[in-house]
């Protein structure tokens, strides 16, 4: 299975990352609804899961793949440790606020609610939660994970993170 995934990544990296992101964003929402909230299938909000999967596949997968490539090519310092710190800082100060803003506002639009209000209520809790885990994850990711697998690593860690994001987005803080 892993070799098949490697072949797909080599041949179509953005498409592969997008499909992976869609599946894992949707899975994070299923975890939020079924494991955390214990809604059961009869009360499961399938539209919410679909919105999460759509965002993961259409926005996050392509954006993260492009972003990691950009960092790899453009954030290169003389010292490898400084390079990692600079990449993590860029990721947390540039990509993360942009990603969270896109996530929160696009979810609000798809839900038919006010995107500005959603951003005002949810951005800071989401960003604070992000800072508790992602700088460390990305430090490890940028240190030891080859470029082509970085989105996969983020997606695997994101199972729990997307569960949290989905709960914050739904007001289940």
Swiss-Prot record:
It holds the Pfam family Mpv17_PMP22. GO terms for cellular component: mitochondrial inner membrane. It comes from the Eukaryota. The keyword Transmembrane helix applies. It is found in: Mitochondrion inner membrane. The chain crosses the membrane at residues 12-32, 52-72, 129-149, 151-171. One of its GO terms (biological process) is ethanol metabolic process. InterPro entries: Mpv17_PMP22. The keyword Transferase does not apply. Keywords: Membrane, Mitochondrion, Mitochondrion inner membrane, Transmembrane, Transmembrane helix. It is a multi-pass membrane protein. Belongs to the peroxisomal membrane protein PXMP2/4 family. PANTHER family: PEROXISOMAL MEMBRANE PROTEIN 2, PXMP2 MPV17 (PTHR11266), PROTEIN MPV17 (PTHR11266:SF17). May be involved in cellular response to stress. Required to maintain mitochondrial DNA (mtDNA) integrity and stability. This is Protein sym1. It comes from Aspergillus oryzae (strain ATCC 42149 / RIB 40) (Yellow koji mold).
């Amino acid at each position: 299975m892993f070799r098949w995934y490697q072949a797909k990544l080599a041949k179509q990296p953005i498409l592969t990352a997008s499909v992976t992101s869609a599946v894992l964003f949707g899975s994070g929402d299923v975890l939020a609804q079924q494991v955390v909230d214990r809604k059961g299938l009869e009360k499961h909000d399938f539209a919410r899961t679909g919105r999460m999967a759509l965002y993961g596949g259409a926005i996050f997968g392509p954006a993260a793949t492009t972003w990691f490539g950009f960092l790899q090519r453009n954030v290169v310092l003389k010292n490898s440790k400084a390079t990692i710190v600079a990449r993590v800082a860029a990721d947390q100060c540039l990509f993360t606020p942009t990603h969270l803003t896109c996530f929160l506002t696009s979810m609000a639009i798809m839900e038919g609610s006010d995107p500005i209000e959603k951003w005002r209520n949810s951005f800071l809790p989401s960003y604070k939660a992000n800072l508790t885990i992602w700088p460390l994850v990305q430090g490890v990711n940028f240190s030891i994970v080859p470029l082509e697998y970085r989105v996969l690593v983020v997606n695997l860690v994101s199972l729990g993170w997307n569960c949290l994001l989905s709960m914050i987005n739904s007001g289940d803080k």
